[in-house]
């Protein structure tokens, strides 16, 4: 059942997996892309042998998936990890974030582009803004630094809640992580206590992560007696 997708309101409460199963006459498994990517990281990436970690995807939008005590967290309505809607200041309460979450507005490709357009009137892609920051553009540098600071705050909040062992970053924006990750790490080093220090790593699976993950989930659904990752609760 598809529920609560702000980008697909017309599909809300649609039993898509059931309909596809009936139409194709084969079992169909659906999963959120970032959660599927987390399962991929658990099988073949940086989340192997880890029981508490977060995968944060920074691309056009912002999302995350959480592994806590060996269990993939889904939440009451399958919406756990929607960190794009996190807020960080009192004045954020007085703005409408329904179409794009507060955190996502400051820490995503679309958010970067919208911030540049509102401040300078230029329609640049996030990659163009990052490149401009590398070339010394003051506004672009300020926006990238702002994104890094918000990302650090978001990670610190996740660590405070879940005491994570590791945070893995993925998504198109993280291919330019050398531009902003040192600032993120410096903020984490400055503000996290010694017993909550967390490793930040970049995914090496990229677009293969969700493919690996959904394959594992599909096999686990069709062949539930087989323990693909015995130490992990997938569903």
List where the protein language model places each region.
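Short glycine-aspartate micro-motif
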Residues: 53-57, 63-65
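General beta-strand structural signal in soluble alpha/beta enzymes
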Residues: 28-32
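A short, polar/charged loop-to-alpha-helix boundary motif
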Residues: 79-92
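Hydrophobic "anchor" residues
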Residues: 2, 72-73
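ATP-binding/phosphotransfer module of carbohydrate and carboxylate kinases, centering on a glycine-rich
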Residues: 18-26, 40-50, 72, 90-235
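A cytosolic small-molecule/anion-sensing beta-strand core signal
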Residues: 68-69
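Active-site glycine-centered loops adjacent to acidic/histidine catalytic or metal-binding residues
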Residues: 33, 59
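Short beta-strand-loop/turn "lid" adjacent to the catalytic site in phosphate-handling enzymes
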Residues: 1-13, 165-166, 171
């Amino acid at each position: 059942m598809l529920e609560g997708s702000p980008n697909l309101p017309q599909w809300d409460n649609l039993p898509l997996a059931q309909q596809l199963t009936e139409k194709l006459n084969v079992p169909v498994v659906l999963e959120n892309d970032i959660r599927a990517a987390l399962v991929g990281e658990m099988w073949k990436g940086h989340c192997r042998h880890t029981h508490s970690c977060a995968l944060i995807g920074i691309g056009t939008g912002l999302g995350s998936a959480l592994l806590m005590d060996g269990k993939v967290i889904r939440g009451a309505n399958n919406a756990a990890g929607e960190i794009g809607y996190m807020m960080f200041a009192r004045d954020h309460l007085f703005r409408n974030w329904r179409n794009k979450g507060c955190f996502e507005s400051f820490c995503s490709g679309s958010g970067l582009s919208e911030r540049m357009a509102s401040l300078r009137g230029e329609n640049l892609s996030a990659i163009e803004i990052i490149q401009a920051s590398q070339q010394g553009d003051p506004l672009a540098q300020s926006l990238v630094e702002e994104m890094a600071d918000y990302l650090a705050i978001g990670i610190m909040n996740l660590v405070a809640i879940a005491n994570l062992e590791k945070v893995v970053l993925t998504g198109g924006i993280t291919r330019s992580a050398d531009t902003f990750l040192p600032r993120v790490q410096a903020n984490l080093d400055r503000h996290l206590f010694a017993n909550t220090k967390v490793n930040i790593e970049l995914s090496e699976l990229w677009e293969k992560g969700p493919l690996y993950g959904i394959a594992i989930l599909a096999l686990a659904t069709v062949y539930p007696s087989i323990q693909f990752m015995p130490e992990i609760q997938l569903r």
